[in-house]
Amino acid sequence: MVLTNKQKEELNGAILDYFDSSGYKLTSTEFTKETNIELDPKLKGLLEKKWTSVIRLQKKVMDLEAKVSQLEEELNNGGRGPARRGKEDALPRQPEKHVLTGHRNCINAVRFHPLFSVIVSASEDATMRIWDFDSGDFERTLKGHTNAVQDIDFDKSGNLLASCSADLTIKLWDFQSFDCIKTLHGHDHNVSCVRFLPSGDQLVSSSRDKSIKVWETATGYCTKTLTGHEDWVRKVIVSEDGTTLASCSNDQTARVWNLAKGECLLTFREHSHVVECLAYSPANIVEVPGSLLSTPEGKAKAKAGAGGTSFGQAGYLATGSRDKTIKIWELATGRCLQTYIGHDNWVRSIKFHPCGKYLISVGDDKSIRVWDIAQGRCIKTINEAHSHFISCLDFCSHNPHIATGGVDDIIKIWKLG
């Protein structure tokens, strides 16, 4: 590209100003003689400004190229571009909306408040932090545990927060006064997960002591202990109707339990490593290829319940493992219908998208992945979503956002769109 005379004059003036302001007096004098120009105050600092502008533009170009590449990959994989998606099936997009910093150790759990623009994070630093996820502002710290806080959960009203810890306790917090109102004792080892039942009058917990416990929230009493896993029970979740539980363990299995009877109904054994996480499907999930639900006869059988046991509206269970895979299981038959392969390291957390079409996963490969359930494959990947392993994920039920937490001690808020 050839410069005009005016552009050459401006460039020479900017170079002369740079030599002079940087202390290169001899060079400045010689340059003045050769170009026959004088210092112009209007050109002061121009070369540095142009240089930094080029760097900023280069970064913008690289970001746009990465975005185009990601969209091309998504479309080539059979995904739908953002313009063709409605609000109800919007997917997480880059860049992140907020980066929340303040914890002094790994983030173990993140949980959105069911009503307000608030999110709570739990950390290895033995604290929980409360944030406004719309503004990204830090609000307060909850202290009380004496070891790593492993998990947190809200009841449906959002008035109660439950937390569990490596200090062997579960704590209940009044989320209006932020006071700890009860401490539950009973587990003999690290308490790794806690979940409220839909009614809010009970909660369940899982532990490294290999057990699952059921607690009354009003009294803090343990009313039931479920045993059967042969190693650390990593996670326990509750079905939407509150009749069944699902758990996963270091023993490489996932189990489904009848809550009222305390009986194990199903055991899934096809993972080859620790099962880290699991999720019940929503009632509006799309049809999974090969499912019993693909025929009218199968639907009737599933509704009646396999082996005389009904699983309510949850037709499927998803599990994520350290074997780097995610599996989709049919509850009515106990069959594995799909195995998702794509993560390059442990799968740490999974959530079904509220629209029922997708599963979102995060893992130690630092990526967020979106899986199309009908196609059985990954349609979107956000690589390097964190600078270290991603340990947890949550969906906001009332605002189109997800949150991720990592071993990099930070929480990220991602807008869906």
From Swiss-Prot:
One of its GO terms (cellular component) is cytoplasm. SUPFAM superfamilies: Lissencephaly-1 protein (Lis-1, PAF-AH alpha) N-terminal domain, WD40 repeat-like. GO terms for molecular function: dynein complex binding. Residues 52-80 form a coiled coil. InterPro entries: Dynein_regulator_LIS1 (IPR017252), G-protein_beta_WD-40_rep (IPR020472), LIS1_N (IPR037190), LisH (IPR006594), PAC1-like_LisH-like_dom (IPR056795), WD40/YVTN_repeat-like_dom_sf (IPR015943), WD40_repeat_CS (IPR019775), WD40_repeat_dom_sf (IPR036322). Residues 72-93 are annotated as: Disordered. Signal peptide: none annotated. Gene3D superfamilies: 1.20.960.30, YVTN repeat-like/Quinoprotein amine dehydrogenase. It is found in: Cytoplasm, Cytoskeleton; Cytoplasm, Cytoskeleton, Microtubule organizing center, Centrosome. GO terms for biological process: cell division; establishment of mitotic spindle orientation; microtubule sliding. WD repeats lie at residues 102-143, 144-185, 186-225, 228-267, 270-339, 342-383, 385-417. Pfam families: LisH_PAC1, WD40. PROSITE patterns: LISH (PS50896), WD_REPEATS_1 (PS00678), WD_REPEATS_2 (PS50082), WD_REPEATS_REGION (PS50294). Keywords: Cell cycle, Cell division, Coiled coil, Cytoplasm, Cytoskeleton, Microtubule, Mitosis, Repeat, Transport, WD repeat. It comes from the Eukaryota. Residues 7-39 form the LisH domain. Dimerization mediated by the LisH domain may be required to activate dynein. Belongs to the WD repeat LIS1/nudF family. Positively regulates the activity of the minus-end directed microtubule motor protein dynein. May enhance dynein-mediated microtubule sliding by targeting dynein to the microtubule plus end. Required for several dynein- and microtubule-dependent processes. This is Lissencephaly-1 homolog. It comes from Heterostelium pallidum (strain ATCC 26659 / Pp 5 / PN500) (Cellular slime mold).
